[in-house]
């Protein structure tokens, strides 16, 4: 089963999803909900609690690994994302006879990244791009997966453009595939990145991150955030990396153009004690 792990870049930290995130997720989900037309995003505390509980139940079976997205600029949880549809092509079989969960040492062979949503205030700020870079790096460079799937409602032009920007290759439309958020039957657009494509996709994502404007103060009035200490911003290193900070604030000396964080241009490293999924 995959390990629960924290992945940190220069703009976001992906934290293992837990019930302690519910209140912050509700705050993020109550902004301009018209942006969630194609995504199931609970709007109140009770529904968000059920949402997180369902994600954790999927994690307990080895099928998913969910995260809360923490924005390092606003110092607030701003959304959620996850690995899902994890499959294990191992021998001996990942699922021992009579068990419905994979062996503790089973590593995913293929994965999907999905169930992603972000508060409107941080959309198109690099949070999604860096989240994908961190997750793709973990999937390909840590797990060694062969393929990562990304999919969305075929009508969701914005999501499809975002997937294409991060290197997803269009595979086709699966017709009448699932029930949409509005209750209609949706067609689903499928994309993927395979292992052979990952080096080019990683370089393109790192270039996109380096082209983003420098981070400054968060927008006034961000729910749950704070402006304290954010007149200048440096990326946060893991405790074990603090002795290796470069002058610009990120661990390790090489920096990308425009002050981008080198952590986001390479395989992400776990930043907190890892615990096995339960």
Predicted regions mapped to residue ranges:
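Conserved beta-strand-loop-alpha-helix junction that forms the acyl-donor binding cleft
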Residues: 118, 150-160, 260
């Amino acid at each position: 089963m995959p390990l629960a792990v924290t992945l940190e870049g220069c703009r976001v930290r992906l934290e293992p999803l837990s019930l302690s995130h519910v209140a912050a997720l509700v705050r993020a989900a109550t902004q301009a909900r018209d942006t969630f037309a194609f995504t199931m995003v609970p709007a109140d505390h009770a529904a968000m609690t059920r949402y997180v509980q369902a994600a954790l139940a999927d994690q307990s079976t080895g099928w998913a690994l969910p995260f809360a997205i923490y924005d390092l600029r606003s110092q607030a949880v701003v959304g959620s994302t996850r690995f899902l549809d994890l499959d294990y092509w191992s021998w001996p079989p990942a699922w021992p006879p009579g068990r419905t969960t994979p062996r503790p040492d089973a590593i995913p062979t293929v994965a999907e990244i999905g169930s992603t949503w972000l508060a409107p205030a941080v959309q198109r700020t690099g949070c999604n791009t860096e989240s994908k870079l961190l997750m793709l790096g973990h999937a390909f460079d840590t797990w060694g997966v062969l393929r990562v799937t990304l999919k969305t409602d075929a009508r969701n032009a914005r999501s499809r453009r975002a997937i294409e920007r991060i290197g997803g290759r269009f595979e086709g439309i699966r017709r009448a595939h699932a029930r949409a958020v509005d209750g209609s039957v949706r067609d689903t657009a499928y994309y993927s990145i395979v292992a052979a494509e990952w080096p080019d996709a990683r370089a393109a994502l790192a270039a996109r991150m380096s082209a983003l404007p420098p981070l400054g103060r968060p927008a006034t009035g961000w729910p749950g955030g704070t402006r304290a200490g954010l007149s200048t911003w440096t990326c946060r290193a893991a405790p074990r990396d603090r002795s290796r900070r470069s002058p610009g604030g990120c661990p390790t000396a090489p920096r990308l153009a425009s002050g981008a964080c080198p952590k986001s241009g390479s395989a992400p490293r776990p930043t907190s004690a890892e615990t096995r999924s339960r």
